[in-house]
């Protein structure tokens, strides 16, 4: 019996009109759809009057679900893999299924379409010839700062996903490690009614979040300029000055002095002082 195929189908990230004709035809024709959340996928399918057999495939059951789906394909059935929004396996479930399909010599067919990180990058005005997608940063501040220090000197454009609950704390740590001068682009609610895309520097971006100019709603794609020789000047100055003040036993005045000289937010400077004291 000839194997079926695995179709990796991108779905809208907000606007249903972004669904391609080819995607709709594939979803209508396949024998089975593997969905991250069958309830959300059913909403998409019902909008386009598509009736299909579905199976759930998410991060907690992917290994077991992949075995069942490979068996279906080996029996000649074609399967479409979809995520809740965007392109499957890009920071979403699907990798294990796709890997097993390749190992079993099953044809894997990509159906291009919406992808939040690529959509944001394309309009960011930042270099896209070399970029690094880091997904979500670690939840805990110490681990987050450790990861950011690894990326501090990376010259590539950096792309992060940040949840609404961690946007302020994540930006504070990013400023602490990268400084406030780097160009940054943030995209929120892309393709939806309240879509918001803003290009500024990291320092201004945090201010806009804190005063509510950028609402803490939805999921954020943050794109940050890669390291350049001159884009961390204020941070280098702040660290050097802070180090001198600490060495001269002026810690009690250091935060106020460095904040005044560099114009970097006080809480960022305070965190910097704590970091430098740990290193001594």
Regions found by a protein language model. Give the residues of each.
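Glycine/small-residue-rich loop that forms an oxyanion/phosphate-binding "nest" at active or ligand-binding sites
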Residues: 66-115, 119
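Class I SAM-dependent methyltransferase SAM-binding "motif I" and its flanking Rossmann-like core
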Residues: 96-154
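Glycine-rich, flexible N-terminal cofactor/catalytic loop recognition
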Residues: 1-60
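General beta-strand structural signal in soluble alpha/beta enzymes
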Residues: 35, 110-113, 160, 186
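Conserved helicase motor
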Residues: 57-63, 137-140
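Short active-site oxyanion
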Residues: 27-33, 106-109, 157-158
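Loop/turn-to-beta-strand initiation segments
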Residues: 5-6, 76-80, 156-157
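A contiguous loop/helix-start segment that scaffolds small-molecule binding in enzyme catalytic cores
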Residues: 3, 157, 164-280
């Amino acid at each position: 019996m000839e194997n079926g195929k695995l179709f990796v189908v991108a779905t809208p990230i907000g606007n249903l009109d972004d669904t391609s004709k080819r995607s709709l035809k594939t979803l209508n024709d396949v024998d089975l759809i593997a969905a991250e959340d069958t309830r959300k996928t059913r909403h998409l399918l019902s909008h386009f009057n598509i009736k299909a057999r579905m199976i759930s495939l998410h991060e907690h059951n992917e290994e077991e679900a992949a075995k069942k789906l490979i068996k279906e394909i080996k029996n000649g059935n074609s399967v479409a893999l979809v995520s809740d929004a965007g392109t499957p396996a890009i920071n979403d479930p699907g990798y294990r299924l796709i890997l097993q399909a390749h190992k079993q010599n099953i044809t894997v067919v990509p159906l291009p379409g919406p992808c939040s990180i690529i959509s944001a990058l394309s309009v960011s005005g930042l270099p896209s010839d070399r970029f690094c997608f880091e997904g979500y940063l670690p939840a805990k501040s110490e681990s987050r700062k450790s990861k950011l220090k690894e990326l501090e000197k990376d010259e590539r454009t950096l792309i992060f996903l940040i949840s609404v609950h961690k946007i302020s704390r994540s930006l504070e740590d990013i400023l602490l490690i990268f400084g406030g001068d780097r160009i940054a682009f943030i995209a929120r609610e892309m393709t939806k009614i309240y879509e918001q895309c803003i290009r500024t520097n990291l320092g201004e971006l945090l201010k806009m979040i804190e005063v509510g100019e950028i609402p803490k709603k939805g999921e954020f794609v943050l794109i940050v300029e890669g390291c350049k020789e001159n884009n961390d000047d204020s941070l280098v100055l702040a660290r050097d000055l802070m180090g001198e003040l600490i060495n001269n036993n002026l810690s009690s005045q250091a935060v106020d002095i460095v904040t005044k000289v560099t114009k970097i937010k006080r809480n960022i400077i305070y965190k910097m002082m704590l970091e430098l004291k740990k290193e001594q």
